[in-house]
């Protein structure tokens, strides 16, 4: 099977490439250092599996890239490779197209099993994460979440400028410099955005921005 590895650390890309290329049924055809490059490599090489890190540079995080790649290249199975053992990240990446989720500190044998599992079209979740979490994901995915009122419409012009920048991973200082406002102003707008939209976390904000098509290439 053909594999692409997306991680912003060169040593990680090299290390995992060595492990995978040693297998008779695996070949790392390309690597990427951020989400944009990952999208380009998948488009070019059409891999069977993409190993995607979540915490990549601001602008195109693994959360954002996962959704876009899953939509554009459904034949490529995405396996999230990360240090985050937070159930909220697992929930959002699975709902946005990933087929599996494994921690970077997992044994090599577990990584290989995860890759072969998603390659077959099955879902793989790291053994450290509970079964109840997967059940919660399935339950929430089947719920009708339609609302009659869209809170997006009550965001101010400045909040609409800041929302996609937050979702792309830019910090308060970086956003302030881009928009020529103070850090305190950005922090205030950020609080207002989360409150108005009823969001409680960064993954929720990223998912919301994706649904509203605010993070297009």
Curated annotation (Swiss-Prot):
PTMs per UniProt: Phosphorylated by NreB.
Any one cellular-component term (Gene Ontology): cytoplasm
Keywords recorded for this protein, A-Z: Activator, Cytoplasm, DNA-binding, Phosphoprotein, Transcription, Transcription regulation, Two-component regulatory system
DNA-binding region: 172-191
Localisation per UniProt entry: Cytoplasm
Xref: PROSITE patterns: HTH_LUXR_1 (PS00622), HTH_LUXR_2 (PS50043), RESPONSE_REGULATORY (PS50110)
Residue intervals of the HTH luxR-type domain: 148-213
A single MF term (Gene Ontology): DNA binding
Identification of the protein by name: Oxygen regulatory protein NreC
Gene: nreC
